[in-house]
A protein has these predicted regions:
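N-terminal type II signal-anchor transmembrane helix
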Residues: 4-42
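Flexible, non-catalytic peripheral segments of proteins
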Residues: 30-33, 37-44, 48-50, 57-163
Length: 163
């Protein structure tokens, strides 16, 4: 009987060790995928210091001296907290939800493409003032900075492939 118990104990110990390692790995990767709200971000496109404070609910408060820097920080913060939502809304405006979620979104995609929301939005840019375009560019620069940070901090995985 002890010949049977010893292999069972070894198997149980190996199973426990493997399970523990998997849990540690998943925890590590999950924690590393969350944004670090306490780090300093440096970018040459920011003209003056910008401070982003988060309250106990992680709601950001941006303090800066220029509108461009504020919009840069806003883009960065949005990409930190809402990147998935931003990508999903972009896919929605392009009428490409069925590429992600399957055939049940084909009718929705057809309607969106018929309304041509994406191209109409792109065409509306020519009616914006130079000041507004500069602010939107600052916002986009903030998003792109966050995407670059994700890529560089990807633990060798690179940027996440969302679709």
């Amino acid at each position: 009987m002890s010949k049977i118990i010893k292999p069972i104990k070894i198997f149980a110990l190996l199973l426990f060790a493997t399970l523990l390692l998997v849990i540690i790995l998943i925890t590590f990767l999950t924690i590393k995928s969350l944004p670090d709200y306490n780090r300093t971000v440096v970018n040459s496109l920011v003209k003056q210091d910008v401070k982003i404070f988060r309250n106990k609910y992680a709601i950001p408060n941006i303090v800066s001296k220029t509108n461009e820097d504020t919009f840069f920080a806003l883009g960065y913060v949005h990409a930190q907290d809402r990147l998935w939502q931003m990508i999903l809304l972009r896919k929605t405006a392009k009428g490409k939800l069925s590429e992600i979620f399957g055939e049940k979104y084909l009718e929705s995609d057809k309607l969106i493409r018929t309304l041509d929301i994406y191209n109409n939005s792109r065409n509306s840019v020519k009616f914006l003032s130079k000041k507004t375009l500069n602010l939107l560019q600052s916002y986009s620069n903030g998003i792109n900075k966050r995407l670059l940070d994700i890529k560089n901090q990807g633990l060798g995985r690179g940027a996440p492939t969302l679709f």
